[in-house]
Regions:
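Von Willebrand factor
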Residues: 64-65, 80-140, 143-188, 193, 218-221, 226-228, 235-239
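Generic recognition of flexible, low-complexity loop/linker segments
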Residues: 74-79, 94-95, 99-101, 111-114, ...
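Alpha-helix N-cap/helix-initiation motif
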Residues: 97-106, 154-162, 209, 213-216
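Acidic/polar low-complexity segments with low predicted structural confidence
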Residues: 1-85
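Extended, charge-rich low-complexity regions and/or helical-solenoid scaffolds
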Residues: 82-92, 114, 124, 173-201, ...
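Acidic, Ser/Thr-rich peripheral helices and adjacent loops at domain boundaries
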Residues: 136-153, 204-214, 250
């Protein structure tokens, strides 16, 4: 079975590359537009550092230094921010429910990563699925990777225990936060958590229950709130059925 999965994963990687190449002109256009939108958003919200200078905007708190200390550095000058102020973790649902659109998701991941990188934002791309009771988080592109080719290795299989995947991503950010102090997690999801492994009995669920439906959504929402309490910003790109749109909002 493992050999068969490896062979299927390699075939899917080839299909992902072929799909992106076939639609290269469209994807390039989307990257350019998205890059411009991200750059404009950064400019609007950017808080540039100000350094002491001999020209620029007069600093009232330093004016006294000119006559008393013969110090002409009584101005503030905007200084370009060379270091990124935040990182982005892009998390792709790689469960079997995504089998029908693997090439599209791989292309979306590449487009988002390329656009963010073009704006100087460090980005890491990971995928997740659950196999035989284990949730697997796979890093396709790390912060230090210049190449985006690893995203072509996106491959869907198994289930999606979203809550556990979100918790694992939080642990990954804690272990390897990247080169910036603030962090944004973007989840590409159909908002339909589902796993074959049942939830074990607990005081709230004496008989246990299936992981899916409202329980799965509540579990994922609770993990999102926990990440937010830890200082991470969490956003979602919804790509599921209209019937699940309300769950995505939760």
């Amino acid at each position: 079975e493992a050999k068969h999965l490896a062979e299927q994963a390699q075939l899917q990687a080839d299909r992902n590359r072929a799909y992106y190449a076939k639609n290269r002109a469209l994807h390039r256009s989307v990257v350019l537009r998205l890059t411009e939108q991200i750059r404009n958003c950064i400019l609007v919200h950017q808080q540039p550092n100000a350094r002491i200078a001999r020209s620029g905007a007069l600093d009232p708190e330093r004016v006294w230094r000119a006559p008393l200390l013969n110090d002409s550095r009584v101005f503030r000058c905007a200084e370009e921010e060379n270091q990124p102020s935040f990182t982005v973790d892009l998390l792709l649902d790689a469960s079997a429910s995504r089998l029908h659109c693997q090439e599209v998701i791989a292309a979306q991941g590449t487009i988002l990563a390329q656009s963010l990188a073009a704006c100087g934002i460090p980005v890491r791309v990971s995928s997740f699925c659950s196999l035989r009771g284990y949730t697997v988080l796979r890093v396709l592109k790390g912060f230090a990777d210049k190449s985006l080719q690893g995203i072509d290795q996106y491959f869907a299989s198994g289930w999606n225990r979203d809550g556990l995947a979100l918790r694992a991503t939080g642990d990954l950010v804690s272990f390897d936060p990247g080169p910036a102090p603030r962090h944004l997690l973007i989840l590409l999801t159909d908002a339909s958590p589902n796993d074959s492994r049942r939830v074990p009995p607990s005081p709230e669920q004496p008989l246990g229950c299936d992981y899916g439906g409202s329980y799965g959504v509540d579990d994922a929402a609770a993990e999102v709130r926990d990440l937010q309490r830890r200082g991470l910003r969490v956003s979602a790109v919804f790509m599921g059925e209209d019937s699940s749109s309300h769950d995505a909002e939760r």
